[in-house]
A protein has these predicted regions:
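Catalytic core of nucleotide-sugar-dependent glycosyltransferases
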Residues: 43-50, 128-151, 185, 215-219, ...
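Membrane-water interface at loop-to-transmembrane-helix junctions
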Residues: 155-171
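Membrane-embedded multi-pass helical conduit in multi-pass membrane proteins
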Residues: 167-265
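Long, low-complexity, intrinsically disordered segments
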Residues: 298-315
């Protein structure tokens, strides 16, 4: 924040602590969970923090800084009204409102993202917990879109109104509905013969390949540039997860997002709990294998683990 006052917020990466060896609140060794659900979320976090947010920050399109790991300029936050109490997506909403306030005042500003700085969180280990979390994220995104709908395609807000906000609407409002309709209409088209099976298969494969390439690229970026995995076995596990997530996990997330839309339409404001197993003094779900890579990289991963409020992550 030591600049000319234009920098109003800075965010960092959040990594998955499930499967890591934790001692007295510190990460001693980085590991990967035995369970598939946390592994899929690990890939998802890599993709969100190392691809999407880095790119959006560089293009001045960043709308979200995770509430658990962000720093805000106090005067800008207070001037915008601080955190709202009537939304379930307060981290997204407050940054949108801060940037909206700066645009309306005609003041230059910046929002930065530092991928090399990270904290660690425990992600949901059950489908019910993941469902509750993603339902609330989706509901919070819709609340923010409607609260600040005057920004949509409004040149007064520059890139924020002309690019960032339309992208948010496309991803969080139209995206789940269109993808669900696709899963429904493709089988119908195949049954009634107005869709070529080859086209349907090719379209599905292209979607999976694109998702896998994005996930694999994020994993390689993390491996080569930031915080490598402790063992080759763990890296292979994540690489496999980046492929398998396209077959079931992704579709399940879309159902949870549709559930979030339904909760919004019903006016549901409840904050559904996400069960936590806890990471205190954990030795990790997997035994961290002693190999040459682990010996060289243990110290660099010693970082404090703090329990994050539910909702921090790759939305």
């Amino acid at each position: 924040m030591a600049d000319d006052g234009a920098l109003i917020a800075v965010g960092g990466s959040i990594r998955v602590a499930n499967g890591c060896a934790v001692s007295e609140g510190h990460i001693e060794r980085v590991g990967v969970s035995n369970a598939w659900l946390p592994r899929f979320q690990t890939i998802e976090y890599f993709r969100a923090f190392l691809a999407a947010r880095v790119a959006f920050a560089r293009l001045s399109l960043l709308l979200l800084i995770s509430g658990a790991f962000g720093v805000f300029r106090r005067d800008a936050l207070v001037a915008a009204g601080g955190y709202k109490h009537d939304t379930v997506g307060e981290d997204l909403e407050v940054l949108v409102r801060m940037q909206r306030s700066m645009c309306e005042q005609g003041r230059p500003y910046r929002v930065a993202f530092l991928p090399e700085v990270c904290c660690w969180t425990e992600v949901p280990t059950t489908i019910v917990g993941l469902r509750n979390q993603r339902t609330r994220w989706q509901q919070g995104a819709i609340e923010t879109l409607l609260t600040h709908r005057t920004m949509l395609f409004n040149p007064r807000y520059g890139r924020l109104g002309l690019v960032a906000f339309p992208l948010l609407a496309l991803e969080d409002l139209a995206g789940p509905v269109l993808e669900f309709l696709g899963y429904f209409l493709i089988p119908v088209g195949l049954i009634f013969g107005f869709l070529d099976p080859k086209v349907a298969i090719l379209f599905f494969l292209l979607t999976c390949v694109f998702g896998t390439i994005t996930s694999a690229g994020s994993l390689l970026l993390e491996e080569w540039q930031l915080r490598p995995t402790a063992t080759t076995r763990d890296f292979a596990r994540l690489a496999v997860a980046s492929i398998i997530e396209n077959f079931g996990y992704r579709q399940m997330l879309q159902l949870f997002r549709l559930r979030g839309i339904w909760h919004f339409l019903k006016g549901n404001k409840s904050w559904a709990a996400v069960p936590r197993v806890g990471l205190a003094n954990s030795t990790g779900e997997d035994r961290i294998h002693s190999d040459r890579r682990a010996k060289d990289k243990t110290i660099s991963h010693r970082a404090e683990v703090r329990p994050l409020i539910d909702g921090e992550g790759p939305r």
